[in-house]
Amino acid sequence: MSDIQSSKYYTKTDPVSIVPLGEYDVARAKEALVELLAPIGGLGFVKSGDVIIIKANLVSAMKPDEAATTHPVLLSALTELLIEAGAAEVVIGDSPGGLYNSAHLNKVYNATGMHDCEAHGAVLNTDFTESEAKFPEAKI
């Protein structure tokens, strides 16, 4: 495990990766993601059987070419890489602006092209259950 993965806070000396993609193609996106993640040890943190949730920045029901949300090609490529690394399930989800219910979330999934990710092994979150969590050490 690299120092970044085990550190609690990031510093100005932590590596930053930028890799040009050129065009939205899943195979090219996979290559770019491998290169992008290499400085922090790649996907070596993924253990066989892991369930991984990707927060996809689905802020609004906008088309992928409007560049307001994470592009479905990048999420499809990342999903494939995570499954190849051993993940049992890759879930894509978010709490987009607006109501957090099935109708609104499906509108966002449709507009942003998230359903395309399902063909690459991703599961779109449709779980709206709530639970209470207590943090007695928290300060207000």
Where are the predicted features?
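N-terminal and secondary-structure boundary signal
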Residues: 1-140
